[in-house]
């Protein structure tokens, strides 16, 4: 199965109207992690990645490269609460928020109807004590994902769009490894859902709509800043090369290579706003970077 955003959103909206499912808020804020992913009750159908009401699929303009894996992203914010806009950083989401990301490979990129192989689902949970991250690895039957505190290696394969079979030793990270990317000033934090990386159009109920506008309507965020400088899609050949390069480096490297990141001692800053010759080791302006 190709877990297409537009398809499962259409299905989930129909199912949501029945209002029969809800997230288990207590599991998100508990001091202990559930042993299996289903205990959170994020999905109507876990295998098909169909979310329950108030668990919203979302996409990023430019995404982290992860050994060619595909990803499905979801966000849950407790009812009556919203994420607050923060300039140049992710929205400040309230306690009880869950960010969910499932990694998978299609069986064959040339025919996505042949299905997919779910590998892991990572969850980032905002508890009273702060954000905590943990990974769940899917079983071979694709019916459940089990907590992996110490991580796991998964041997898998897939056929790419050129018809070449690729073997992958996929690594599910342990809990300490999550901190390597999600650590800002030595505190775990989300790194993906920044306004500038969410500012794109998606299809909702058959109609195109700006993603930020949708999240605002759904009460996930409290505002949309004016004059957003959206990141470039690094795979879009119509965009200037320097903008694509900056977007790729910012998303793949900038969360560590910034003043508050774990690689700050290198003084090589690659976050989106870095323009200093000293920190970029390049030219003075963004336009001359590449």
Segments and roles (model prediction):
Residues 1-9:
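Bacterial N-terminal signal peptides that target proteins for export
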Residues 278-287:
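Conserved small/polar residues in nucleotide/adenosyl-binding loops
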Residues 32-35, 244, 248:
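Extracytoplasmic/secreted proteins, especially bacterial periplasmic and envelope-associated proteins
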């Amino acid at each position: 199965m190709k877990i297409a955003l537009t398809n499962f959103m259409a299905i989930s909206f129909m199912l949501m109207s029945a209002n029969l499912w809800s997230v288990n808020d207590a599991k998100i804020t508990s001091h202990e992690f559930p042993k299996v992913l289903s205990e959170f009750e994020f999905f109507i159908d876990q295998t098909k990645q169909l979310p329950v009401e108030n668990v919203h699929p979302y996409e990023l303009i430019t995404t982290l490269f992860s050994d060619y894996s595909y990803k499905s992203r979801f966000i849950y914010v407790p009812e009556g609460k919203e994420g607050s806009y923060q300039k140049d950083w992710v929205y400040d989401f309230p306690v009880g928020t869950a960010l969910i990301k499932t990694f998978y490979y299609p069986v064959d990129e040339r025919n996505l109807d042949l299905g997919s192989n779910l590998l892991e689902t990572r969850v980032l949970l905002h508890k009273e004590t702060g954000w905590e991250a943990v990974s769940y690895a899917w079983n071979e039957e694709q019916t459940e994902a089990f907590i992996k505190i110490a991580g796991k290696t998964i041997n898998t394969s897939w056929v790419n769009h050129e018809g070449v079979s690729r073997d992958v030793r996929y690594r599910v990270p342990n809990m300490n490894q999550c901190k390597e990317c999600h650590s800002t000033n030595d505190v775990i934090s989300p790194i993906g859902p920044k306004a500038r990386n969410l500012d794109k159009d998606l299809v909702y109920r058959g109609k195109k709509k700006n993603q930020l506008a949708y999240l605002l309507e759904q009460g996930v965020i409290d505002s949309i800043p004016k004059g957003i400088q959206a990141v470039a899609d690094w795979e879009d050949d119509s965009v200037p090369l320097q903008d694509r390069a900056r977007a790729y480096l910012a998303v793949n490297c900038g969360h560590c290579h910034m003043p508050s990141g774990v690689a700050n001692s290198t003084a090589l800053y690659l976050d989106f706003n870095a323009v200093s010759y000293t920190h970029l080791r390049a030219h003075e302006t963004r336009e001359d970077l590449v």
